């Protein structure tokens, strides 16, 4: 990272600016990782759980650092944070809309200026009312979780798995699942088993994997799905 890509790691940096659907500031003075984390937390605190939000960076070193700060802020509010590989803003907007996310944040670096562009569940730039809510949450300060169970899961979006996961979620009676949490053992191929596990974890269930040994099929019992 060159001198011109310097980042100040301090909570005493000057406050960032909210302009339309964008939160921006100088990367070496205002938009610190701590500030980006607070924006992510304020953005995620508006969602009804369970929920997930996507985060993407334009690819510059500064934007990648801020991306991980935003992911941590989202997860701190119990919302699952999904990292998306570097992509254009229009491609990210499409990803948010098609993967069942409650919203998304695109981290862009324009010279010295770093900006976070906020999207709703339809991949549309956040409305003025929603941005006022995010700004109020940002100014309110930290809302720290008290239990590990209150933290969201940080994962990666890869397209096909997320589409399958969204289809499973659409066919689940969420209220019943949330009110009847238990532990299940899953016997399934690696890829589908991973998706099913994530769905159950999002709903607060405990998951045990039953793996095949010596080339045999996974072992099933009365708790296996």
Regions found by a protein language model. Name each.
Residues 2-70, 74-77, 150-184:
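An N-terminal, well-structured beta->alpha segment
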Residues 36, 41, 71-73, 97-99, ...:
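Generic alpha-helical propensity signal that fires on short helical segments
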Residues 21, 107, 185-189:
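Active-site flanking residues adjacent to catalytic metal/cofactor-binding acidic residues
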